[in-house]
Design a protein with these regions (language model features):
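Short alpha-helical patches at coil-to-helix transitions and adjacent helical residues
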Residues: 86-90, 209-213, 419
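Non-catalytic, conformational "gating/processing" segments within enzyme and secreted inhibitor domains
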Residues: 33-38, 79-80, 117, 121-286, ...
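Non-catalytic interaction/Regulatory regions outside core domains
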Residues: 8, 33-46, 361, 367-369, ...
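Extended hydrophobic
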Residues: 215, 265-283, 397-431
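Detector for small/aliphatic-rich hydrophobic stretches
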Residues: 5-177, 428
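Extracytoplasmic/secreted cell-surface and envelope-processing proteins
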Residues: 102-108, 289-292, 331-333, 383, ...
């Protein structure tokens, strides 16, 4: 049995609810995003009886997201710059999983690394409410956009919208996809821009044909270096990319101490941000003529993770000269679908997709991802968004000193060391 969305609205209007919002962070709380009259927010009308979670470990979330990150890395082109947030993609897919059943749900959870769904959702919810410092923080926001002319499951509020709000702080909007598509596009773009601090101002130019629902995750990270670079020590120098040599702005630090490792093939360094245990880890070949792509790509997922983790127990040494390029990288992946299907998420795209907690006869049409990073003397700003389009189906200390000169291709991750979770991962082949 299905009811029109107006029935949900009527039911929702009789409920007193909690406000849905993005993660609270100092000086940057997205909260409810302003929309115009063409969009109706249902968030406050969805009642959540929140149960306090007693989470002391984020092991399942960390293991799942980090494994997903390694799979993404291997699936993306090896000869290009890449930058993405597995945390963002996993968050969006996890919200989709709330509405899934049967084989569709099993495939999503296998790909995400979910072994205990209740624990996974509790870890997600707890991480979303994490307190951050003024200088280093992560903002996460989720939203559900529903076409007002679509018939939804009679129990969509109980089965999907309420847990999406409870576990993922999901904001819920009803909009006229068919009658006012341009205004819907404007509101969606405004929501993403607001929740990425304007780093990603636009994700849509039009609503893809047949779309009845959009699930969107937005992540914004800002971190100030614990040991900042200074502009007077930034000067132009060569970066020897895979395809060309280019002259770029290189930042320098001299005689500072950092955690450093070298296994004979790959060397790495940890660059901490101020407070909250978030760090950037950078990896390069040890040999001057080494190739980070060849060395890193030959490692299994487990070996990649061990390499990243090895910096946690490495020595803190004096780095005689640290040289890091000042750079901006922006990546857009319009269509993660083949990658996700290769990870085992197949039925979600087919006529046999089971999202019956949302509606019968709907399937995923596309999953898209955009990410941007800015690295400068003060620190790092990074943002990412993941959007899932749902359509109707045919159915419906050391004495030794070291140098770390980043003047050739490198791999880097932004990691929350309090959980061990990789928030962003990237590779720079050329600048």
């Amino acid at each position: 049995m299905k009811k029109r969305m107006t029935a949900l609205l009527l039911s929702a209007c009789m409920c007193a609810g909690l406000a849905g919002c993005g993660t609270n962070t100092p000086g940057n709380n997205p909260g409810h995003t302003k929309t115009d009259s063409s969009v109706t927010s249902l968030t406050d009308n969805i009642t959540v009886t929140s149960v306090k979670t007693d989470i002391t470990s984020f092991d399942q979330l960390k293991n799942g997201i980090n494994e997903f990150s390694m799979n993404m890395y291997s699936a993306l082109p090896a000869d290009e710059n890449i930058f993405y947030s597995s945390y963002s993609i996993s968050s969006a897919l996890s919200m989709l999983d709330v509405g899934a059943n049967g084989a569709t749900k099993k495939e999503l959870e296998n790909a995400l690394g979910i072994t205990d769904l209740d624990e996974w959702n509790a870890e997600m919810k707890t991480y979303l409410s994490k307190d951050w410092s003024q200088n280093t923080f992560v903002n996460t926001a989720n939203s559900v956009w529903m076409n007002k002319d679509t018939s939804w499951s009679a129990d969509i509020e109980k089965d999907f919208l309420t847990p999406a709000k409870d576990y993922y702080s999901g904001e819920v909007y009803e909009a006229d996809f068919n009658g006012q598509p341009d205004k819907v596009v404007q509101n969606v773009n405004n929501w993403v821009s607001t929740n990425t601090n304007k780093m990603i101002p636009e994700i849509l130019k039009e609503i893809p044909g047949g779309t009845v629902m959009m699930l969107i995750n937005a992540v914004y990270f800002e971190g100030k270096w614990d040991t900042p670079f200074t502009e007077d020590k930034t000067f132009q120098s060569s970066f020897y990319g895979t395809d060309k040599e280019s002259v770029v702005d290189m930042m320098h630090l001299y005689g500072e101490h950092f955690t450093y490792m070298d296994n004979g093939e790959i060397k790495g360094i940890t660059l901490p941000y101020d407070g909250d245990n978030v760090v950037m880890k950078v990896f390069m070949p040890t040999a001057d003529d080494g190739d980070i792509n060849e060395l890193f790509d030959k490692l299994s997922n487990e070996e990649k993770q061990k390499l990243i983790d090895s910096l946690d127990n490495a020595n803190n040494v004096e780095i005689d000269t640290l040289q890091l390029p000042k750079f901006t990288d922006e990546q857009s992946i319009d269509g993660l679908d083949e990658i996700l299907q290769n990870m085992g998420i197949r039925s979600a795209y087919s006529d046999s997709a089971d999202f019956s907690k949302i509606a019968d006869g709907i399937a995923v049409s596309s999953v898209n991802h955009r990410a941007k990073v800015i690295v400068d003397e003060n620190g790092t700003k990074a943002a990412a968004e993941t959007d899932i389009m749902v359509k109707e189906t045919a159915m419906m200390p050391s004495e030794e000193t070291y140098n770390f000169i980043v003047d050739k291709p490198f791999v880097y991750v932004i990691e929350d060391q309090s959980t061990g979770m990789i928030l962003f991962m990237g590779r720079v082949n050329s600048l």
